[in-house]
Protein backbone atom coordinates (compact mmCIF):
# COMPACT_ATOMS: atom_id res chain seq x y z
CA UNK A 1 0.00 0.00 0.00
CA UNK A 2 2.80 2.43 0.86
CA UNK A 3 4.43 1.85 -2.53
CA UNK A 4 1.19 2.49 -4.42
CA UNK A 5 0.35 5.68 -2.53
CA UNK A 6 3.91 7.00 -2.80
CA UNK A 7 3.93 6.46 -6.55
CA UNK A 8 0.45 7.88 -7.08
CA UNK A 9 1.44 11.08 -5.29
CA UNK A 10 5.00 11.14 -6.61
CA UNK A 11 6.42 11.15 -3.08
CA UNK A 12 10.14 10.42 -2.83
CA UNK A 13 11.58 11.92 0.37
CA UNK A 14 12.11 9.39 3.15
CA UNK A 15 11.91 9.87 6.90
CA UNK A 16 14.11 8.21 9.50
CA UNK A 17 12.08 5.18 10.56
CA UNK A 18 14.71 3.51 12.71
CA UNK A 19 12.38 3.83 15.71
CA UNK A 20 9.92 1.38 14.12
CA UNK A 21 10.92 -2.07 15.29
CA UNK A 22 9.06 -4.09 12.66
CA UNK A 23 10.63 -2.56 9.53
CA UNK A 24 14.01 -4.05 8.74
CA UNK A 25 16.39 -1.91 6.69
CA UNK A 26 16.96 -4.94 4.47
CA UNK A 27 13.24 -5.35 3.67
CA UNK A 28 12.23 -4.57 0.09
CA UNK A 29 9.58 -2.16 1.38
CA UNK A 30 11.83 -0.23 3.78
CA UNK A 31 12.18 2.88 1.60
CA UNK A 32 8.47 2.92 0.72
CA UNK A 33 7.57 2.79 4.40
CA UNK A 34 10.06 5.59 5.13
CA UNK A 35 8.55 7.74 2.37
CA UNK A 36 5.00 7.03 3.60
CA UNK A 37 5.97 8.06 7.15
CA UNK A 38 7.53 11.26 5.81
CA UNK A 39 4.38 11.94 3.79
CA UNK A 40 2.43 11.36 7.04
CA UNK A 41 0.15 8.83 5.39
CA UNK A 42 1.47 6.03 7.61
CA UNK A 43 1.67 6.78 11.32
CA UNK A 44 2.07 3.44 13.04
CA UNK A 45 0.34 2.35 16.20
CA UNK A 46 2.14 4.61 18.66
CA UNK A 47 4.25 1.78 20.06
CA UNK A 48 6.89 1.56 17.35
CA UNK A 49 5.08 -0.64 14.83
CA UNK A 50 3.96 -0.04 11.24
CA UNK A 51 2.90 -3.65 10.51
CA UNK A 52 4.19 -3.62 6.92
CA UNK A 53 3.48 -7.29 6.31
CA UNK A 54 -0.12 -7.27 7.52
CA UNK A 55 -3.11 -7.06 5.23
CA UNK A 56 -4.56 -3.57 5.24
CA UNK A 57 -8.14 -2.94 6.31
CA UNK A 58 -10.60 -0.72 4.54
CA UNK A 59 -10.55 1.86 7.34
CA UNK A 60 -6.75 1.93 7.23
CA UNK A 61 -6.79 2.60 3.47
CA UNK A 62 -9.46 5.28 3.85
CA UNK A 63 -7.33 6.90 6.55
CA UNK A 64 -4.15 6.78 4.47
CA UNK A 65 -5.88 8.45 1.52
CA UNK A 66 -7.59 11.10 3.64
CA UNK A 67 -4.25 11.96 5.27
CA UNK A 68 -2.54 12.09 1.86
CA UNK A 69 -5.20 14.54 0.67
CA UNK A 70 -5.19 16.43 3.98
CA UNK A 71 -8.93 15.91 4.37
CA UNK A 72 -10.03 16.58 7.93
CA UNK A 73 -13.32 17.07 9.70
CA UNK A 74 -14.73 17.02 13.20
CA UNK A 75 -18.27 16.43 11.92
CA UNK A 76 -18.87 12.68 11.98
CA UNK A 77 -22.57 12.85 11.03
CA UNK A 78 -21.82 11.50 7.54
CA UNK A 79 -20.99 8.17 9.19
CA UNK A 80 -24.59 7.74 10.35
CA UNK A 81 -25.59 6.49 6.90
CA UNK A 82 -23.48 3.36 7.41
CA UNK A 83 -25.30 0.52 9.15
CA UNK A 84 -22.00 -0.70 10.62
CA UNK A 85 -20.67 2.68 11.75
CA UNK A 86 -20.18 1.36 15.29
CA UNK A 87 -17.41 -0.88 13.91
CA UNK A 88 -15.34 2.11 12.74
CA UNK A 89 -12.35 2.60 15.02
CA UNK A 90 -12.36 5.89 16.90
CA UNK A 91 -9.02 6.95 15.35
CA UNK A 92 -10.41 6.40 11.82
CA UNK A 93 -13.73 8.24 12.13
CA UNK A 94 -12.34 11.63 11.09
CA UNK A 95 -10.87 10.19 7.91
CA UNK A 96 -13.84 8.05 6.90
CA UNK A 97 -16.17 10.94 7.59
CA UNK A 98 -14.08 13.28 5.43
CA UNK A 99 -14.21 10.84 2.50
CA UNK A 100 -17.93 10.14 3.00
CA UNK A 101 -18.74 13.87 3.07
CA UNK A 102 -17.14 14.19 -0.36
CA UNK A 103 -19.01 11.16 -1.71
CA UNK A 104 -15.90 9.03 -2.19
CA UNK A 105 -17.17 6.18 -0.02
CA UNK A 106 -20.80 5.18 0.07
CA UNK A 107 -21.13 1.69 1.50
CA UNK A 108 -22.38 -1.52 -0.05
CA UNK A 109 -25.92 -2.63 -0.92
CA UNK A 110 -26.63 -3.07 2.81
CA UNK A 111 -25.23 0.37 3.70
CA UNK A 112 -22.15 -1.19 5.28
CA UNK A 113 -18.69 0.31 4.88
CA UNK A 114 -17.02 -2.82 6.32
CA UNK A 115 -14.23 -0.90 8.05
CA UNK A 116 -12.54 -3.93 9.63
CA UNK A 117 -12.50 -6.03 6.44
CA UNK A 118 -9.32 -6.29 4.41
CA UNK A 119 -9.50 -4.20 1.26
CA UNK A 120 -9.19 -5.92 -2.12
CA UNK A 121 -7.22 -4.57 -5.06
CA UNK A 122 -10.47 -4.02 -6.93
CA UNK A 123 -11.94 -2.01 -4.06
CA UNK A 124 -8.78 0.07 -3.81
CA UNK A 125 -8.78 0.76 -7.55
CA UNK A 126 -12.44 1.82 -7.37
CA UNK A 127 -11.71 4.13 -4.44
CA UNK A 128 -8.84 5.78 -6.32
CA UNK A 129 -11.14 6.22 -9.33
CA UNK A 130 -13.86 7.69 -7.11
CA UNK A 131 -11.39 10.29 -5.85
CA UNK A 132 -9.40 11.00 -9.01
CA UNK A 133 -11.42 10.88 -12.19
CA UNK A 134 -8.44 12.38 -14.02
CA UNK A 135 -4.81 11.50 -13.31
CA UNK A 136 -2.20 13.53 -15.18
CA UNK A 137 1.28 12.04 -15.26
CA UNK A 138 2.76 13.49 -18.47
CA UNK A 139 3.86 17.04 -19.26
CA UNK A 140 1.37 18.27 -21.83
CA UNK A 141 -1.55 20.63 -22.37
CA UNK A 142 -4.93 19.23 -21.33
CA UNK A 143 -8.12 20.83 -22.60
CA UNK A 144 -10.43 18.19 -21.17
CA UNK A 145 -10.59 16.63 -17.73
CA UNK A 146 -13.49 14.99 -15.96
CA UNK A 147 -15.23 17.60 -13.83
CA UNK A 148 -14.39 15.93 -10.55
CA UNK A 149 -11.05 15.90 -8.75
CA UNK A 150 -7.84 15.93 -10.75
CA UNK A 151 -4.44 14.62 -9.66
CA UNK A 152 -1.45 16.24 -11.37
CA UNK A 153 1.78 14.37 -10.90
CA UNK A 154 3.90 15.90 -13.65
CA UNK A 155 5.62 19.23 -13.96
CA UNK A 156 4.86 20.97 -17.21
CA UNK A 157 1.20 19.96 -17.17
CA UNK A 158 -1.10 22.73 -18.36
CA UNK A 159 -4.88 22.78 -17.99
CA UNK A 160 -6.36 24.89 -20.80
CA UNK A 161 -9.87 26.36 -20.39
CA UNK A 162 -10.98 23.68 -17.97
CA UNK A 163 -13.29 23.83 -15.01
CA UNK A 164 -12.68 21.42 -12.16
CA UNK A 165 -15.57 21.12 -9.72
CA UNK A 166 -13.60 19.03 -7.24
CA UNK A 167 -10.07 19.26 -5.95
CA UNK A 168 -6.93 19.82 -7.98
CA UNK A 169 -4.22 17.85 -6.21
CA UNK A 170 -0.62 18.64 -7.08
CA UNK A 171 1.42 15.52 -6.29
CA UNK A 172 4.76 15.67 -4.51
CA UNK A 173 6.43 14.51 -7.71
CA UNK A 174 5.82 17.92 -9.28
CA UNK A 175 8.11 19.57 -6.75
CA UNK A 176 8.61 23.28 -7.36
CA UNK A 177 8.21 23.01 -11.12
CA UNK A 178 5.44 24.89 -12.93
CA UNK A 179 1.94 23.58 -13.45
CA UNK A 180 -0.54 25.94 -15.06
Could you say what each language-model-derived stretch is?
Residues 2-31, 38-59, 65-93, 105-122, ...:
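Feature responds to low-complexity, polar/acidic, surface-exposed segments characteristic
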Residues 37-38, 100:
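Alpha-helix C-terminal capping/helix-coil junction sites
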Residues 136-180:
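Short, T/G/N/S-enriched strand-turn elements that build extracellular solenoid repeat scaffolds
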Amino acid sequence: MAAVINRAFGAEIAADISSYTDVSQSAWYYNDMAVAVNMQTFEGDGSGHLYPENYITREEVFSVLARALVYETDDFSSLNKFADNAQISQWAKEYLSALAQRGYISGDENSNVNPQANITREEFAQLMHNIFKTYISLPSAYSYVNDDSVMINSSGATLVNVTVNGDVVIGDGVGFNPVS
